[in-house]
Swiss-Prot record:
One of its GO terms (biological process) is choline transport. Keywords: Antiport, Cell membrane, Glycoprotein, Membrane, Transmembrane, Transmembrane helix, Transport. The keyword Transcription does not apply. The keyword Membrane applies. Residues 1-27, 247-249, 327-354, 464-494, 578-593, 655-707 are cytoplasmic. Disulfide bonds: none annotated. This is Choline transporter-like protein 4.
């Protein structure tokens, strides 16, 4: 029944000796479409580069529209706001700074932010009251004929300065300011001045708590990056050592891995029981705590530890049952891993191919990021005349709609508080009106290129490992440069097929992004039915994406071996897997699970080491090598864990692809051959012994044995 529904088993082909040498180009239409799309993607990048100016985001501007830190303001990377009260009243200062906006007060580029309090005394001389560094370049305090009051009225120098810190090159007031007792501004009393400045500073700090958090995170990275790199190097070394050990002792390592997981869960059960027993004797119950958002409280009640204990016990029981009933399947999985170890041992260059994939992925991400940045900053900046208080005599006619040029703008005598401030970027013109469409094109190009690079790596590795499996006399029949040959063969003949498969995956991922966007926009305004429908759609497309990734992976293996187009290869791979569905579910997934556990060992080991190091729990006798004092020690720990997982995934993905390729070839081998002299098996003797298969010796040897 299975044969009729999912096709007949593959028949023996005497001429088949592994990946077919003579093949033609596949999915040419999709190849042409992909090339045209890439040309369009390059055009989008060129247009973005011509029209965009990322300096508008990277560098702040002064009141004249000049960038701080470059050009005439070289060495002055920070911008200082003269009247902080106007910034708080007129606009959201941090949001304005992040979007390139300016608040309605004079801004100048400065080398460093103010470190001390300073305020203007009306009876002093300009040189003694003001600081030249923080005044506009047009005024010289030693030679100016203007008085202190006239300079303050024209905002040529700041009336007051408070200790500030630089955040994204903007000078913001520091927290917990202690004002001098005689501090006064704008004719206010000392108490009123302190109250106004404190309120302005607190509004900024309270509205943007992430200011200090973000700054501290950057500081943590600056302090800990050498140790982060050291931890990532350790992760790479551990991954290589694990693969080397797997090369020689696959069976022992797999069983140690399984026993280790069971032991860790067993220890978790023991620890939960001890915590439960201690809290039970103390009589602390969840009824005594009630409902609270402080999750740490729940770990001080016995019911929490009892629930965790039950869950771990159930997981432990399931694992033991799986080991009991699937022991033979695990032995076959171990044999596949051993065979993969042998294959990688003969094709060591395959371990370095993830570096090629990584470089290509970095190029894709960098191109997407730069294109998005240049597109976002395209269009000339528009400035408009604005003032904080339109009720001031002479400022009634200022509506905020009149454009201006910050390079030539000067306040009128009737409204001295008028300022020329940034409004937005110009969105008129053919290019600017299509920015949203170009950003969508950029996202699609990013997803398609990323998926194509991953597909290329899978197909290249599949071709290399397939050449190992179908080599009857190993290693004599293995090509000299299997990875390089597979790479050139894949690019020459199957670019269209890889583009086709990656396009299908890109469409599904794009639909998922749209669903996430719709869900985000409708959050808080959707009814339960809409929420349920969106949740179902997101779940379905998540499953569809996983299925397409699985199908594409096996289709690329068939493409690498037989050189057929994507649809035929996907169909043949799907039918082959369905004809052997039990082996697929048990053998392939058990192997994937074991490799996943290997990743966890690498990531967990390096993560635990990073935790003890960055939390200061590892005593280092040498003072020159010690964990830095960090604000948030979990930031480098998370970075190390994520980086370790990426490194481990890169190395183990080679193993995973090798096992998947050998498994698919193994299924084809079982269908094509029967062990006879005309149809000998290509699988290793260990696999044949587990399956009770063997190749019959030649007739001449049989006669010798009979004699």
């Amino acid at each position: 029944m299975a044969s009729e529904e999912y096709g007949e088993p593959a028949k023996h082909d005497p001429s088949f000796k592994g990946p077919i040498k003579k093949r033609g180009c596949t999915d040419i239409i999709c190849c042409v479409l992909f090339m045209v799309f890439l040309l369009g993607y390059m055009v989008v990048g060129i247009l973005a580069w011509l029209y965009g100016d990322p300096r508008q985001v990277i560098y702040p501007r002064n009141s004249t529209g000049m960038y701080c830190g470059i050009g005439e303001n070289q060495g002055k990377p920070n911008v200082l706001y003269y009247d902080l009260l106007k910034c708080v009243t007129g606009t959201n200062i941090l949001a304005a700074a992040m979007n390139g906006l300016q608040c309605p007060t004079t801004q100048v580029c400065v080398a460093t932010c103010p470190m001390d309090f300073k305020w203007a005394l009306p009876n002093g001389s300009p040189a003694s009251v003001y600081i030249q560094e923080y005044c506009q370049p047009s005024i010289n305090l030693t030679t100016t004929p203007l008085t202190v009051a006239q300079i303050a009225a024209k905002e040529l120098c700041p009336v007051f300065l408070v200790p500030s810190t630089s955040f994204f090159n903007r000078c913001f007031p520091g927290s917990n300011l202690t004002f001098p007792s005689d501090f006064t501004i704008n004719g206010l009393t000392a108490n009123q001045s302190r109250a106004n400045i404190s309120e302005a500073a607190s509004q900024i700090l309270d509205s943007f708590n992430f200011q200090n958090v973000g700054k501290k995170i950057f500081e943590d990275f600056a302090k800990s990056w050498p140790w982060i790199i050291t931890a990532l190097v350790i992760a790479m070394v551990v991954s290589l050592l694990f693969l080397i050990l797997l090369r020689f002792t696959a069976g022992i390592l797999v069983w140690v891995l399984i026993v280790g997981v069971i032991g860790v869960i067993g220890y978790g059960i023991y620890h939960c029981y001890m915590e439960y027993d201690t809290l039970n004797k103390q009589g602390v119950s969840v009824s005594d705590v009630g409902f609270t958002f402080n999750l740490g409280v729940y770990f001080r009640v016995k019911e929490t530890w009892l629930a965790i204990l039950i869950v771990l016990a159930v997981v432990e029981a399931i694992l033991l049952l799986v080991l009991l009933f699937l022991r033979k399947r695990i032995l076959i999985a171990i044999a596949l891993i051993k065979e993969a170890s042998k294959a990688i041992g003969h094709i060591m260059s395959s371990l370095f191919y993830p570096l090629v994939t990584f470089v290509l992925l970095v190029v894709c991400v960098a191109y997407w990021g730069m294109t998005a940045l240049y597109l976002a900053t395209s269009g000339a900046p528009i400035y408009r005349i604005s003032t904080v208080n339109t009720s001031v005599p002479g400022c009634e006619n200022i509506t905020g709609n009149e454009t201006c040029n910050p390079m030539t703008f000067k306040p009128s005598s009737s409204c001295n508080e008028a300022r020329c401030i940034f409004y937005r970027y110009n969105n008129e013109g053919l290019f600017q009106t299509n920015l949203f469409n170009l950003q969508i094109y950029n996202v699609i190009g990013f997803l398609w290129c990323i998926n194509f690079v991953i597909a290329l790596g899978q197909c290249v590795l599949a071709g290399a490992f397939a050449s190992y499996y179908w080599a009857f006399h190993k290693p004599k029949d293995i090509p000299f440069f299997p990875v390089a040959e597979s790479f050139m063969r894949t690019l020459r003949y199957h670019t269209g097929s890889l583009a086709f498969g990656s396009l299908i995956l890109t469409i599904v991922q794009l639909i998922r992004i749209i669903l996430e966007y719709v869900d985000h926009k409708l959050k808080g305004a959707q009814n339960p039915c809409t929420r349920f429908l969106l949740c179902c759609l997101k779940c379905c497309f998540w499953c569809l994406e996983k299925f397409i990734k699985f199908l594409n992976r096996n289709a690329y293996i068939m493409i690498a071996v037989y050189g057929k187009n994507f649809c035929v290869s996907a169909k043949n791979a799907f039918k082959l897997l369905m004809r052997n569905i039990v082996r697929v579910v048990v053998l392939d997934k058990v192997t994937d699970l074991l490799i996943f556990f290997g990743k966890l060992i690498v990531v967990g080991g390096v993560g635990v080491l990073a935790f003890f190091f960055f939390s200061g729990r590892i005593p280092i006798p040498n003072d020159s090598f010690k964990s830095p004092t960090l604000n948030y020690y979990w930031i480098p720990i998370i970075t190390v864990v994520l980086g370790s997982y990426m490194i481990a995934h890169g190395f183990f993905s080679v193993y995973n692809m090798c096992v998947d390729t050998l498994f698919l070839c193994f299924l084809e081998d079982l269908e094509r051959n029967d062990g006879s002299q005309e149809k000998p098996y290509y699988m290793s003797k260990s696999l044949m012994s587990i399956l009770n298969k063997k190749n019959r010796p030649p007739k001449s040897e049989e006669k010798k044995k009979k004699k």
